Amino acid sequence: MAGVVLPASIQPQLLRPLAYRILTKKFGLNIKSDGLVALAAYIGTVFGLYWRQNSETTKFLEQFAIIWREQGRGLFVDELNVSQVINEIKEREKIEQDQHVEKRNNLHKANNLDAFLKRPNSPTDTEITTLSQGSATSVVNPDSHSPMMLEEGSPINSDSEPISEHERANGISNVDQQLDWLDYFKVIDAFNQQTFTYDHTKRQYIYVPRPKEVEKNMLSIAKLKLPNVESKVSLFTTRYHIIKDKVLRNEKFQNNDIFNPLSSIIEMGKHMNESDVSPLNSASYMKITQIKNLLGHDGKNFLLLGLLDQNSKGNWSLEDPSGSIELHLQQAIPTKGTYYVPGCIVLVEGIYYTASNTFVVSSITHPPGEKREDTIEAIGNLDLLGAYNPSNENYVARLDKDLKIRLHYLEQELSDNKFVILGGDIYLDEMTTMDGLKKTFDKLTTDPPVAIVFNGSFVSVPVHPSLNAKNVSATVSYKNNFDALATLLSNYENLINDTHMIFIPGPNDPWTSMVGLGTTTMWPQKIIPSSFTQKMSRICRKVHWGSNPLRIAYLSQEIVLTRDDLANRFKRYNIVFPTVEEEKYLENAELQEQYSRNPDVSVGQLIAFKNNLPVSVLESRKLVKTLLDQQHLSPFSSRIRPTVWDLDFTLQLSPLPSSIMLCDTSAPAFDVTYNGCKTINPGRFIHKRAAKYIEFFPASKVLVEEELPF
């Protein structure tokens, strides 16, 4: 598109034949009238009167179609998407032009003859540089009396630098050496994370720019973080459509026209858990029915997907965007190994009865999971976190596959990089905690990690307006605790200079503790106010006061850090199914009967013989599977765990992160990998006069549990 042209006004019907030949016949896109008008206006402005004879017009339309297909913008070319794609083409051309100018400037500086002659002597000055075939071979030595050869292809008058055979052989390693891993290490706060909304009609994410303040000194929604009503309306609808699209991508749901009522979702779960899955036949395909389509189909079997919650009568109901229906769970058989709580999105199979307008559930399960790579490919390789490049109004950043491969190789080279995750409830107001921290820092200072994660709460009593026996307010005492931690850290130069200190607040930390008093409050939770952390920020060079939850972009990986007692909340609100209770009763009766026949064998031995896995392992797997299948850090209804409406997207786990550091003090420490996502719980920091933490190596995803008695 180089050169100066006279703009022209092109009638859309004149452009239609060329656009139809390229966009429709070649790329399978359907052009709408407003989209054709936008294309004609741009082509007339850029290519002028001779746009027909200019081959760049065809190249532009082909580039337009390629970007359109890459971004998955659908089949219909409309005005809004045309303007977005054109803006992205402009942005790419601008970046390429800037890089080209910068490269030529650098080459001009490097190839300047005066600068070349003024270089000091070095071993490379006397090396013989072998150029490409057909170019001259010369010995460069400024101090020698031999004439200097300036042949075509030499490094002095060539536009490109020569590449030696050694560099060609090690091209990949040389490229990797140019990457600085610190440029791809980012700590992303939930309140500063870039916003994407999900458009279920186009099945793609839409970037939403942050609102700009009208005046600097005026309070605005951006400052107060007040959500709007639309965010509340779309809160669970967005979750529903994200999970539904994930379900429809599963091979069991590929055929929308066939559904065999005899192939229940329990059998589907068994097939999915098998290692060697036989080829799918048509009878195993399943179809999801909307609730509004149940009317008039009395006594028929259906499969529904919806939000599980209680209605105004206190009965269980299922809700989707088309409507809601009351559930009868007396005969429901749930799949084992998961929790069922109000707010979960579940698959239910059963029979609809028109008389009572109820749905008698025969089986219930969570949606099937999906691996991170599959989800990223399905959404068009979007960089939702902005880890590599931030998105803006004119450009939506995407994950570069080549860069991702290079970063992966760089991760393997940095195999010694490690993260230290301390256990939760680091009560700085207790002397035992300070002793444990001192013991931990003594060991870590010899080999400083990349980051140390401090999980709250950082005080044993919730911070609230009160005075203690010494007439010291709770806020002053809270600040003094962090000052004491800063004084302790000042003795470890390696840690305060080289290690990233990441602090994640807990339920007792301000300011949410003022309202919740240590109970469940709004999520995400804001960072600890700076008025309490001034000394820590002054002593530590790399300190991050993070929100809860928090995300880390480490090279090609995404790591989620969160502090929440999920195990207790899942157990408290888990639905009790009569069929499960009956099964437990029969199992206990069988154990008692076996014990009566053989009194020498204890009940514990009988249980261990039946199931060799410990209860703690089963519970941890149950928690992780529920969390990752729901693809949300808080799969509860709003009355159980309220969330900030317009920040619910920061709690989404779609796509699944590479690792989740879930600090849950109500559950024992565990390490569970599900669908390629490694979930780690360090447990409690102080346990029986011992400091517990975990060393995590992201390159190999290996963790080492440490326990330091003091």
UniProtKB/Swiss-Prot annotation:
Record has Nucleotide-binding as a keyword: no
Region feature (Disordered): 116-167
The keyword Repeat is assigned to this record: no
Polar residues biased stretches: 121-144
Superkingdom of this protein's organism: Eukaryota
One Pfam family in the UniProt entry: DNA_pol_E_B
Annotated signal sequence range: none
Main location per the UniProt record: nucleus
Complex formation: Heterotetramer. Consists of four subunits: POL2, DPB2, DPB3 and DPB4.
Further remarks about this protein from its record: In eukaryotes there are five DNA polymerases: alpha, beta, gamma, delta, and epsilon which are responsible for different reactions of DNA synthesis.
Function: As accessory component of the DNA polymerase epsilon (DNA polymerase II) participates in chromosomal DNA replication.
Protein's UniProt name: DNA polymerase epsilon subunit B
Organism the protein comes from: Kluyveromyces lactis (strain ATCC 8585 / CBS 2359 / DSM 70799 / NBRC 1267 / NRRL Y-1140 / WM37)
Phylogenetic lineage: Eukaryota, Fungi, Dikarya, Ascomycota, Saccharomycotina
